[in-house]
């Protein structure tokens, strides 16, 4: 029935395209009408359209004419020179109908999926122009500084011709320059630049003059799937150096390395023993049918199953798994030990290991033997694995009648400090083990200039300045014997998911979005529209070729490269990691095939390598760096011989990454072909392939070196990828649910901070805080289960300790209610502050004369104090929230929902934050002392309460570090 309705009415995509096509026809009609206008008359259209918008005409109504203006300008500029990145090139682009259609979709808030070479950059100019007519902030978000600069110079020339201003945010631009850029009609920049400016404005700026942004109206995100999905879990963090090094990493690194080495030796021994027993059978296509022989083989496979739980990448294990029958036996033991009735036997078997490694979930677990080894041989402590039950310990202290109240407080402080130390030690141990067991050099990171540089798993690009969180980066630094740097302290943070939700209107463009359409809809309320290509795609997509072993796969890849290379076709070989790219490079050198390598280690030569990749006979080995945002242009000879051939050495866990790699060839009607080579030892196959696929391997194993190739295998691979994508989507959604809690708190604090910065009557805000604190403290003390008279001395003692204020106890006793007492205390405190403020004004006037604005100076002092304590308490709150987030998962043991627990406890923490901010502000305001001489200039009395910031090459795009002037680094 649904299929019938779809055939009758068309799919939602078809209906949307049909509706937008009518608007395209209107644009073309206006384009013809604008042709007779002079250049000056066409330029004046911008002012005319702006005026019509201000008079109430909607952007939707003006769209056909505005888009026609842009199209007409593009046609008029054909052949004129444009300087892009220091090079002169002639303008040669006029939007096709499909580009106009994509531009309409973007204005309507769609994500447009346009194939490589279809002109996404030009398409974006039309909605940018239309929305800039409002005078509100319009941003084009790119994936790197180079593209932002290029697009601003290149297609931004159209906007400038029409009288609009354009600017580009480049990392490291000074404050005044950034303010000037944000005043432009259209601003180009990366997600991190826009995001960090938002965080700076709301957490670092100490005056309105230091804030650069002017709001969030409309944004178009280029490579939107990369930014909103691949980077979704990576928060933007402004941080500064911590107060001190965490000594745990220095103390434990050698001990952890020793424990991991013991595990490695144990697994190697088990694997070699199994290898000796199976040596005779490895070259047999079919195993013997003898029952006793099979039982013996099965026992050796049981040992290898144990090795797979301790060292999943053990070489002997991988060699044995090349045999389909032996692989099936190992998998059979895995199924056996996963059965509920065999759990005890599984635990007993796994207890032989020191550490159990769960490669599928990227996790690990110390066994009892591992813990015992840690305590006895590695010099660790049993207390590393036992956390203190704080509630129980506090209850014991409270019930100990031999302790005085002061002793009880001191004992609780000591217990709390011991708990903190144990948690820090246990956390450091866990991160060091993770660094050794799960993080691979040249896969997850590279070592460069005594630093650990993260490799982006989706793009293959190095990420200098970005650091793994929660101490993992320091653990890797200790593993690789590079300088262990200080832990950073977070000043401000936001995820890209919540940052882009700040915009009133959002749109995007990419070559691969349809596979993630569900996530775009549910998380961002964005629909995906696939825009037809201008020319038919001539790419030949071959079926994947499957090989039993990695060795056979690489042999086939080299043969394929040699065969294609003979004809002169340029070849792009995509690899999943730096390690694989270097391995393949060595194999090609052995076969005397000239080639170029592009990976995270030589990314500086990227532009040069990509420029040559489309030439006749070129062979380029690249990581995912070449899979997105690169436009490989063919020379004429390469087109004649059949265009670029893309070879994938494995399937990525995301279908989008594979589609991006395929999309490097056959752009804009050029010829090309793509083929992927896989082995059953690939990570995707090992961890996520279905049992059905393993059964097929056993029954249809071809002779060694021959490939299996069938659309059925492609379907099974796609199923595995969908399974991984679904899991990753769940993780991202889960992360967002937690971050949404933090986001509401962030918005509240930033709103309060901006109110303090912008308020013309800061004195009233200060008095409001004083009133809140007085009412809160008085009500808290007076609401105890004592007669009111008993609580009044405590209230008097607290007020005398915290503020220079003497209470009249007898007057308070005569008041009729607790509320009346609280209000009286608040009035007294507010009056005392009024007197202090007046005396400060008099002191400054006496010291500096009547020519200075003493009242304004005092207000600036109050503003600075309030901002300082908002920032300090917010930083502490961020640490508390991180700790809560890391611990709340354990609540599942008590049959509690961690998310609900997190929401509840984070609310309590936030209430505590608001209270602590107000108390800190009020105490500081009452303790302000002015020390001046008549020679001092009045502006010197304003305290400096914020650190300066730098953004240099040492601090990369995802974490911005704040360096105070006094820091010795």
Curated annotation (Swiss-Prot):
One of its GO terms (cellular component) is plasma membrane. GO terms for molecular function: ATP binding; protein-exporting ATPase activity. ATP binds at residues 99, 117-121, 631. It is a peripheral membrane protein. Keywords: ATP-binding, Cell inner membrane, Cell membrane, Cytoplasm, Membrane, Nucleotide-binding, Protein transport, Translocase, Translocation, Transport. InterPro entries: Helicase_ATP-bd, Helicase_C-like, P-loop_NTPase, SecA, SecA_CS, SecA_DEAD, SecA_motor_DEAD, SecA_preprotein_X-link_dom. The keyword Methyltransferase does not apply. SMART domains: SecA_DEAD, SecA_PP_bind. Its EC number is 7.4.2.8. Transmembrane segments: none annotated. GO terms for biological process: intracellular protein transmembrane transport; protein import; protein targeting; protein transport by the Sec complex. It catalyses: ATP + H2O + cellular proteinSide 1 = ADP + phosphate + cellular proteinSide 2. Part of the Sec protein translocase complex. Interacts with the SecYEG preprotein conducting channel. Has a central role in coupling the hydrolysis of ATP to the transfer of proteins into and across the cell membrane, serving as an ATP-driven molecular motor driving the stepwise translocation of polypeptide chains across the membrane. Monomer and homodimer. Part of the essential Sec protein translocation apparatus which comprises SecA, SecYEG and auxiliary proteins SecDF. Other proteins may also be involved. This is Protein translocase subunit SecA. It comes from Chlamydia felis (strain Fe/C-56).
């Amino acid at each position: 029935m649904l299929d019938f309705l779809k055939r009758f009415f068309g799919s939602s995509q078809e209906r949307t395209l049909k509706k937008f096509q009518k608007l395209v026809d209107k644009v073309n009609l206006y384009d013809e009408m604008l042709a007779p206008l002079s250049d000056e008359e066409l330029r004046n259209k911008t002012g005319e359209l702006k005026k019509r918008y201000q008079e109430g005409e909607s952007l939707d109504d003006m769209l056909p004419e505005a888009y026609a203006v842009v199209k007409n300008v593009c046609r008029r500029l054909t052949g004129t020179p444009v300087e892009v990145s220091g090079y002169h090139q002639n303008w040669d682009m006029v939007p096709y109908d499909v580009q106009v259609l994509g531009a309409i979709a973007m204005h309507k808030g769609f994500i447009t999926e346009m194939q490589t070479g279809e002109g996404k950059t030009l398409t974006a100019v039309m909605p940018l122009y239309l929305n800039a007519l409002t005078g509100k902030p319009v941003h084009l978000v790119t994936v790197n500084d180079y593209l932002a600069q290029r697009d601003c110079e290149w297609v931004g020339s159209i906007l400038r011709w029409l009288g609009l201003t354009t600017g580009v945010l480049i990392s490291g631009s000074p404050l005044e320059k950034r303010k000037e850029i944000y005043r432009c009609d259209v601003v180009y920049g990366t997600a991190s630049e826009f995001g960090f400016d938002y965080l700076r404005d709301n957490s670092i700026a100490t005056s309105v003059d230091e804030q650069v942004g002017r709001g969030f109206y409309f944004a178009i995100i280029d490579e939107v799937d990369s930014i909103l999905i691949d980077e979704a879990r990576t928060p933007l963090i402004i941080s500064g150096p911590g107060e001190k090094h965490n000594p745990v990493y220095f103390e434990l690194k050698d001990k952890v390395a020793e424990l991991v080495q013991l595990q490695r030796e144990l697994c190697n021994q088990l694997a070699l023993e199994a290898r000796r027993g199976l040596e005779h059978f490895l070259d047999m296509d079919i195993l013997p049918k003898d029952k006793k022989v099979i039982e013996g083989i099965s026992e050796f496979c049981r040992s290898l199953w144990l090795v797979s739980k301790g060292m999943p990448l053990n070489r002997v294990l991988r060699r044995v798994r090349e045999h389909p029958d032996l692989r099936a036996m190992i998998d059979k033991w895995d199924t056996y030990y996963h059965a509920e009735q065999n759990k005890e036997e599984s635990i007993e078997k796994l207890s032989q290991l020191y550490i159990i490694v769960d490669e599928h979930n990227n996790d690990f677990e110390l066994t009892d033997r591992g813990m015992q080894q840690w305590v006895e041989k590695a010099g660790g402590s049993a207390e590393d694995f036992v956390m203190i039950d704080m509630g129980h310990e506090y209850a014991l202290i409270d019930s100990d009648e031999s302790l005085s109240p002061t002793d009880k407080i001191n004992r609780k402080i000591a217990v709390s400090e011991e708990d903190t130390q144990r948690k820090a030690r246990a956390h450091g141990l866990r991160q060091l083990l993770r660094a050794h067991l799960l993080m691979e050099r040249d896969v997850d990171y590279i070592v460069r200039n005594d630093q650990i540089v993260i490799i982006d798993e989706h793009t293959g690009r190095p990420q200098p300045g970005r650091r793994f969180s929660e101490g993992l980066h320091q653990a890797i630094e200790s593993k690789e014997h590079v300088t262990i740097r200080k832990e950073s302290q977070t000043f401000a943070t936001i995820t890209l998911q919540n940052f882009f939700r700040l915009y009133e209107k959002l749109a995007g463009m990419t070559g691969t979005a349809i596979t993630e359409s569900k996530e775009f809809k549910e998380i961002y309320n964005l629909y995906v529209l696939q825009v037809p290509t201008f020319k038919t795609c001539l790419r030949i997509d071959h079926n994947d070729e499957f090989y039993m072993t990695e060795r056979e796969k690489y042999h086939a890849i080299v043969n394929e490269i040699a065969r294609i290379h003979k004809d002169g076709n340029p070849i792009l070989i995509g690899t999943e990691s730096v390690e694989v790219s270097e391995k393949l490079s060595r194999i090609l050198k052995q076969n005397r095939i000239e080639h170029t390598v592009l990976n995270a280690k030589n990314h500086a030569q990227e532009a040069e390598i990509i420029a040559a990749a489309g030439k006749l006979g070129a062979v380029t080995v690249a990581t995912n760096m070449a899979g997105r945002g690169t436009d490989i242009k063919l020379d004429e000879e390469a087109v004649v011989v059949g265009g670029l051939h893309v070879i994938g050495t494995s399937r990525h866990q995301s279908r989008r990454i594979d589609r991006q790699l395929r999309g490097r060839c056959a752009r804009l009607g050029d010829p090309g072909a793509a083929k992927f080579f896989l082995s059953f030892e690939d990570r995707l196959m090992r961890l996520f392939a279905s049992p059905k696929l393993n059964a097929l391997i056993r029954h249809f194993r071809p002779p060694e070196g021959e490939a299996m190739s069938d659309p059925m295998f492609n379907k099974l691979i796609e199923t595995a990828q969908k399974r991984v994508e679904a899991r990753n989507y769940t993780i991202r959604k889960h992360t967002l649910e937690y971050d949404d809690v933090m986001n509401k708190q962030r918005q509240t604090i930033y709103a309060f901070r901006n109110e303090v910065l912008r308020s013309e009557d800061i004195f009233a805000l200060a008095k409001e805080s004083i009133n809140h604190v007085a009412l809160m403290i008085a009500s808290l003390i007076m609401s105890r289960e004592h007669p009111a008279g008993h609580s009044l001395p405590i209230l008097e003692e607290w007020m005398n300790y915290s503020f220079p204020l003497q209470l009249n106890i007898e007057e308070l006793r005569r008041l009729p209610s607790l509320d009346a007492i609280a209000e009286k205390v608040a009035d007294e405190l507010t009056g005392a502050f009024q007197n202090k403020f007046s005396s400060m004004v008099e002191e400054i006037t006496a010291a500096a004369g009547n020519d200075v604005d003493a009242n304004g100076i005092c207000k600036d002092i109050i503003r600075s104090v309030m901002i300082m304590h908002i920032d300090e308490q917010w930083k502490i709150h961020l640490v508390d929230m991180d700790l809560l987030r890391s611990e709340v998962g354990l609540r599942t043991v008590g049959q509690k929902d961690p998310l609900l627990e997190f929401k509840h406890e984070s609310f309590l923490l936030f209430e505590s934050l608001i209270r602590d901010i107000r108390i800190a502000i009020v105490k500081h305001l009452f303790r302000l002392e002015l020390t001046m001489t008549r020679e001092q200039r009045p502006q010197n009395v304003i305290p400096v309460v914020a650190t300066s910031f730098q953004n240099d090459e040492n601090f990369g795009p995802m974490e911005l570090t704040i360096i105070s002037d006094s820091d010795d680094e």
